[in-house]
């Protein structure tokens, strides 16, 4: 099955967050898909964590290397459609890119973000749990 994976899923795995084991278990044997903005959002998230002193500088590079080992199919982002979702639900565009991808591909969404889960359910996207 194809699963749309949110940025926080990749970050959780790379940083050995408590959700890592469950994420690996429920995605094993499935194809991960994400919008083509994923690498940029991961880079932004890692440096934001560094700026907040949640990650050391050297941890940013090592987390990026771990993320690069996770197979993911990057798909074109329909920004216009995603902006419509962002405006309708008062979201950041980055969150809407993943919702648009899941909606467009009719695939379930895997995210740790409870707000995204709520919006996904509201627009008829299945949450992969």
Predicted regions and their residues:
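Active-site neighborhoods of divalent-metal-dependent phosphate/nucleic-acid chemistry enzymes
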Residues: 69-115
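Short, well-structured N-terminal submotif of metal-dependent ribonuclease cores
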Residues: 1-37, 49-61
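Residues that scaffold the ATP/ADP-binding catalytic core of kinase and kinase-like folds
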Residues: 12-14, 45, 119
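Helix N-cap/coil-helix junction residues
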Residues: 54-55, 91, 125
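Active-site-proximal, substrate-binding regions of enzyme catalytic domains
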Residues: 43-70, 77-79
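Structured helix-beta-strand junction loops
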Residues: 29-30, 70, 105, 123
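Acidic, PIN/NYN-like endoribonuclease modules and their adjacent C-terminal/linker elements
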Residues: 2, 35, 99-129
């Amino acid at each position: 099955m194809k699963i749309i994976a949110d940025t926080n899923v990749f970050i959780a795995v790379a940083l050995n967050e408590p959700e890592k084991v469950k994420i690996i278990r429920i995605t094993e044997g499935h194809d991960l898909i994400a919008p083509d903005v994923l690498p940029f959002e991961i880079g932004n998230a890692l440096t934001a964590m560094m700026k907040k002193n949640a990650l050391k500088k050297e941890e940013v590079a090592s987390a990026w290397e771990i993320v690069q080992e996770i197979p993911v199919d990057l798909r074109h982002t329909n920004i216009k459609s995603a902006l419509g979702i962002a405006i309708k639900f008062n979201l950041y565009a980055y969150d809407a890119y993943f919702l648009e991808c899941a909606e467009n591909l009719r695939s379930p969404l895997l995210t740790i973000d409870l707000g995204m889960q709520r919006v996904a359910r509201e627009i008829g996207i299945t949450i992969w749990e």
